[in-house]
Swiss-Prot record:
The keyword Mitochondrion appears for this protein: yes
Matching InterPro entries: RNA_pol_mitovir
Annotated TM spans: none
Phylogenetic placement of the source organism: Eukaryota, Viridiplantae, Streptophyta, Embryophyta, Tracheophyta
PANTHER family according to UniProt: MITOVIRUS RNA-DEPENDENT RNA POLYMERASE
Cell compartments where the protein resides: Mitochondrion
GO cellular component terms listed in the entry, alphabetical order: mitochondrion
Name of the molecule in the record: Uncharacterized mitochondrial protein AtMg01110
Organism: Arabidopsis thaliana (Mouse-ear cress)
Amino acid sequence: MSVLRRIPQDGTFHQEGPIHRLAKRRPRFIASFDLSAATDRWPVPVIYELMACLFGQTMASCIVNGALALNSCSLKSVTGRHDEVVFVAGQPLGYYGSWALFALSHHAIVWLAALRAYPHQTRPFLDYALLGDDIVIADRSVAKEYRSLLDALQVDISDAKSIVSETGCLEFAKRFWVKIMSKDLSPVSAKAVLESYFLVGTQQLAYKYKLSPKTCLRLNKAGYRVLGQMDTTLRPYPGVLVGFRRYLVSF
């Protein structure tokens, strides 16, 4: 996990951080791929080779083979025969190192795609954002090579859920961004709106979505008369008004 923390394009510790960095580069072409059951279909040899390259074959055997490839279980088939089954793809549920292993190997695939697209480039490829199986690539050639690599690994990409945009639109970590990632058009959950009828819920909603005081009052069924006279009573006391607003809408 400490390795992931050092990769600016990884969103494990800050989900929106890679998107904000990518937005500063103002890319037009963006490919936001949705991987179908990636954690179930990701090949174990890919993870093993990456760990062997980073930490040596002995450590890779302990981390990967000891927990995945050599960890067999007996299953009873429909014919009544007991068969020994081992992992050749995917990862077991609850495995402690699952996220880090998958994320690191996913980064390696993106880097390999960049190397295949630009074999003579010496600078690291930075035009992407990654969070687990969420991937955004802001380079047409690298996106093409990435798709080719996943086809070779037999990891499917859902075209119906993927977004290939020429105007900077993408979906990343359940958030939908448009206009070169400058506008967040992600929907607000109905649960959050219903909880806004309580003061604590209103504060949380205002803090998360940066709502104005008038918007918060409208969510609590305030009419135009209330909104028009918001400042009337406390107008002689601007300091009190500012403090009261801050208390209502944010901490």
